[in-house]
Amino acid sequence: MKIKTLTVSDLTNYIKKVIDNDFILNNLSVKGEISNLKFHSSGHIYFSLKDNNSKVNCVMFKSKASLLNIALEDGMEVMVKGRASIYTATGSFQLYCDEIKKEGQGELFIKFEALKEKLSKSGYFDEKYKKNIPMYAKRIGIVTSSTGAVIRDIINVTKRRNSLVDIILYPAKVQGDNAYKEIIAGIEYFNKKKNIDIIIVGRGGGSIEELWNFNEEELAKVIFNSKLPIISAVGHEVDFTISDFVSDVRAATPSQAAEIAVPLLSDINTRIYEISKSLDYEIQKKLKDCKSRLESNERILKLHSPISKIVNSYLEIDKLKDRLYFAIDIKIKREKQKIESLNNLLSANNPIKVLNKGYAIIEDENNNIIKEISQLNEEKEISVSLSDGNIKGNFIPIK
């Protein structure tokens, strides 16, 4: 039997026809857990439906999605009603959903919530343990794949913001079995390395299964115990992992992580200029204060210096000498006036002046002045003082 050769389109169209004509596959209900959920701008919803062993892609078009009365999320256990078919453009098998009903929470989601609650109660998410991101990081350690878009985005943002910042990559698997162990090794490597300011742990978006390594408890504990601040940049803005909660800062995307970690060079230059102006002002102010204190101390020193004290003492002595001379002069003048007054008094009462007027002073032999005749009641020797001399004689009473 000759084997027929088919084109790819022939093959996919044939499989699609077989599936579309299958009674069971044309109208079925499938139970599973939602993962890798995406809401397209067109209004269509894309996700995967999985269980422990298998996964199938699903799509719900806008016309059906607008009728949904539940909010879909990753990890949700649902019952999907619709049909199976082939998307011929890619040859992929998928379910076309007409209805989606919530059944419960998926196994991974339950596991995620349990670990989240456990770590939260243990204080792993507390703000008081969050380390500050340095304002002016010089060297940033990156733990991510060496070939993904994450490292390219971080490098591009870093070059744009500040080309002086160094990026050091620790290449690690970010998806697959035990990938979290390589991420742990990267964090521990940078904690031992000198001069690293920040660590960024990142990868692109994905389903809950693809991001599950970032939900491992062992990784969460290593992030918590890191001496260096860690920025978590896992998935897209709508994706959250345990690593996001325990990290010091959660960035919605790797590019945003670089924006947070890398300071703008223009901001640094502006800050340096402001600090320079402030320092110059403070230095000038300090110099002015020092000069003022120096001048004040100089004046005080002059007042209390030995030479100043000697000069002041001389000045004080001169003042005292002037006061003493003045007091002596006043005293002399007063005494002179007293002497002149006494001299005038003596002069006024000088006996010689009386004698000049023709009077005489009579004294007995004992130099007693004879004032009355009764003092001469017998013969006595007397002395008579005249203006031009003295004469002696005997007193003879008249009988």
From Swiss-Prot:
Pfam name, any one: tRNA_anti_2
Chemical reaction(s) catalysed: Exonucleolytic cleavage in either 5'- to 3'- or 3'- to 5'-direction to yield nucleoside 5'-phosphates
Taxonomic superkingdom: Bacteria
Subcellular location: Cytoplasm
GO cellular component: cytoplasm; exodeoxyribonuclease VII complex
Keywords carried by this UniProt record: Cytoplasm, Exonuclease, Hydrolase, Nuclease
Main location: cytoplasm
EC number: 3.1.11.6
UniProt cross-references to InterPro entries, sorted A to Z: Exonuc_VII_L, Exonuc_VII_lsu_C, OB-fold_nuc-bd_dom
GO MF, any single term: nucleic acid binding
Gene Ontology BP, a term: DNA catabolic process
Disulfide bond positions: none
HAMAP family: Exonuc_7_L
Function: Bidirectionally degrades single-stranded DNA into large acid-insoluble oligonucleotides, which are then degraded further into small acid-soluble oligonucleotides.
PANTHER family: EXODEOXYRIBONUCLEASE 7 LARGE SUBUNIT
Quaternary structure, from the entry: Heterooligomer composed of large and small subunits.
Family: Belongs to the XseA family.
Protein's UniProt name: Exodeoxyribonuclease 7 large subunit
